């Protein structure tokens, strides 16, 4: 069975020091893979590399068995990245948009976006479509990101410190969603 994500010897240098050095990681279908480290150890940089948000100095990123880094064709990168859902440590959506408007921003980026699924998660997570993003608590902002991440048939979820700062109930609810996501053995989660 092919890995959903594979990082092969990735390195990233900032100024004269490494922020990542020779990182290798594989995420198989059905796994929840977490990695920990001290502040500044490179967790967020690793996630940004997996998402293709930074240029690497060395190594390769493979998604769904195909190379997906700066050396892969743009169309291949777009297609493969559309199969990833992500949750960042802070809510990235424009603060003036309402929860119900986020779909118009995110949906077009994913060919497999499902409006009905998104509406279902908004309802299930107790989000009010009329609430502005700036008025969401940290936990509700995470739920909004998770609703987006789960609404386009992603094979892999990548979460950057998604449980940091969440209250115990919100953390447990998030972890329950992740367990449900991988239950079929075909989907995976990478989280820091």
Question: Predicted regions: what is each one?
Answer:
Residues 51:
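Helix-to-loop junction immediately C-terminal to a conserved catalytic motif
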Residues 59-72, 79-80:
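Conserved ABC transporter NBD signature motif
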Residues 41, 168-170:
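Helix N-cap at the start of a conserved alpha-helix in ABC-type nucleotide-binding domains
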Residues 157-161, 166:
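Catalytic Walker B motif of ABC-type/P-loop ATPase nucleotide-binding domains
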Residues 36-38:
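The feature captures the beta-strand-to-loop junction immediately N-terminal to the Walker
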Residues 78, 82, 86-145:
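ABC-family P-loop ATPase nucleotide-binding domains
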Residues 171-185:
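Helical segment within the ABC ATPase nucleotide-binding domain
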């Amino acid at each position: 069975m092919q890995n959903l994500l594979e990082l092969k010897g990735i390195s990233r240098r900032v100024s004269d020091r490494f922020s990542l050095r020779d990182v290798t990681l594989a995420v198989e279908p059905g796994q929840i893979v977490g990695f920990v480290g001290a502040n500044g150890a490179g967790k967020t940089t690793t996630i940004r590399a997996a998402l293709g948000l930074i240029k690497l100095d060395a190594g390769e990123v493979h998604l769904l068995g195909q190379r997906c880094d700066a050396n892969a064709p743009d169309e291949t990168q777009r297609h493969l990245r559309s199969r990833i859902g992500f949750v960042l440590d802070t809510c990235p959506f424009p603060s003036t948009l309402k929860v119900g408007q986020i779909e118009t921003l995110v949906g077009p980026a994913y060919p497999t976006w499902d409006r009905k699924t998104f509406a279902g998660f908004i309802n299930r997570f107790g989000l009010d479509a009329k609430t502005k993003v700036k008025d969401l608590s940290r936990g509700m902002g995470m739920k909004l990101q998770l609703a987006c991440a789960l609404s386009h048939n992603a094979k892999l979820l990548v979460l950057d410190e998604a449980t940091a700062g969440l209250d115990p109930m919100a953390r447990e609810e998030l972890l329950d969603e992740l367990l449900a996501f991988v239950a079929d053995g075909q989907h995976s989660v990478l989280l820091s």
